[in-house]
Regions:
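Conserved phosphate-binding/catalytic loop of the ribokinase/pfkB sugar-kinase fold
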Residues: 90-110
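Active-site cores that bind ATP or allylic diphosphates and position pyrophosphate for catalysis
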Residues: 104-107, 111-200
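A short acidic, often aromatic-flanked loop/helix-cap motif at beta-alpha or helix-coil junctions
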Residues: 9-13, 95-98, 156-160
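Short acidic-hydrophobic, aromatic-tinged amphipathic segments that line or gate anion-handling sites
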Residues: 2-8, 89
Length: 200
């Protein structure tokens, strides 16, 4: 897996299947989304790419209410790698970026960056100033720029939609068995799995 800061030039010009979002925690819903991207790319002999943000947008938009990260950036990158994604592109989220309208955002961070064949997004993905960018806008951009668009349905466990905000709430309430069910892996406060003394 190749990791790029957005100021770094992407090596090569291989056509891509792309997804974009925060992916905090890489829970089962995120894994379903990245799995769809990886499978589509493999089926079409394309590169799979994931676009994400650092810091978390909420840290810039609402600095007095800092977001509780579910896992460390180091663990997040390891989970991206485990997912089979070929490329991760990290956008520095700044106050200036937060002011970009949706069309300008899509042009700068998707259309100019990638030879985009297909974009796969989560059901709740929004982008651009005031979150005005949505599926309808992306569908129009796809028709104008020759890429296809797919929206992945929410991932549910027992009718409950798995989301990062839900997992943060469960962590605050110390309901760790449910946290691990929604993450699909063990959870620790440090963001890494801690081994015991293994005395039997």
């Amino acid at each position: 897996m190749q990791v790029y800061r957005f100021r770094e030039k992407r090596s090569g010009d291989r056509p891509c299947v792309v997804t974009i979002g925060n992916f905090d925690g890489m829970h089962l819903g995120h894994q379903a989304l990245t799995g769809a991207v990886v499978n589509e790319a493999k089926d079409r002999d394309l590169s799979s790419a994931l676009v994400t943000f650092h810091p978390h947008p909420q840290e810039i938009l609402h600095p007095r209410r800092p977001v509780q990260r579910i896992c460390t950036p180091q663990l997040q990158n390891r989970l991206f790698d485990d997912s089979g994604i070929d490329e991760v592109h990290v956008i520095p989220f700044t106050p200036e970026l937060a002011e970009l309208d949706a069309d300008a955002f899509a042009s700068r961070y998707l259309l100019q960056r990638f030879k985009l064949e297909k974009l796969i997004i989560g059901y709740d993905f929004r982008f651009g100033k005031n979150r005005t960018g949505d599926f309808i806008l992306l569908e129009r951009l796809g028709q104008e720029n020759g890429f296809s668009l797919e929206e992945v349905a929410p991932f549910r466990i027992k009718s409950q939609i798995v989301s990062s905000s839900l997992i943060r709430q469960l962590i605050r309430e110390m309901r760790f068995s449910e946290v691990e069910e929604y993450l699909g892996r063990p959870y620790s406060l440090l963001g890494t799995v801690q081994k015991g003394e293994q005395r039997g």
